[in-house]
Amino acid sequence: MAKKSMIAKAARKPKFSVRGYTRCQICGRPHSVYRDFGICRVCLRKMANEGLIPGLKKASW
């Protein structure tokens, strides 16, 4: 889980637009966030395995 201070800091508009970054909407993780879903890879995998994301399933070949 991300620190609450870092989540609050990321929510503010940065002085320069290039300094903005995405965070996971569920856990607040700053790295490996999928833009299409707005969540990180950890939460994406967990939710996909539980069947909470429609149209997404684990690949098997």
Swiss-Prot record:
Pfam families associated with the record: Ribosomal_S14
Native species: Campylobacter lari (strain RM2100 / D67 / ATCC BAA-1060)
An MF annotation (GO) of this entry: zinc ion binding
InterPro entries per the UniProt record, alphabetical: Ribosomal_uS14 (IPR001209), Ribosomal_uS14_bact (IPR023053), Ribosomal_uS14_CS (IPR018271), Ribosomal_uS14_sf (IPR043140)
PROSITE patterns: RIBOSOMAL_S14 (PS00527)
Textual note on the cofactor: Binds 1 zinc ion per subunit.
Protein's name in the database: Small ribosomal subunit protein uS14
Its job: Binds 16S rRNA, required for the assembly of 30S particles and may also be responsible for determining the conformation of the 16S rRNA at the A site.
Protein family per UniProt: Belongs to the universal ribosomal protein uS14 family. Zinc-binding uS14 subfamily.
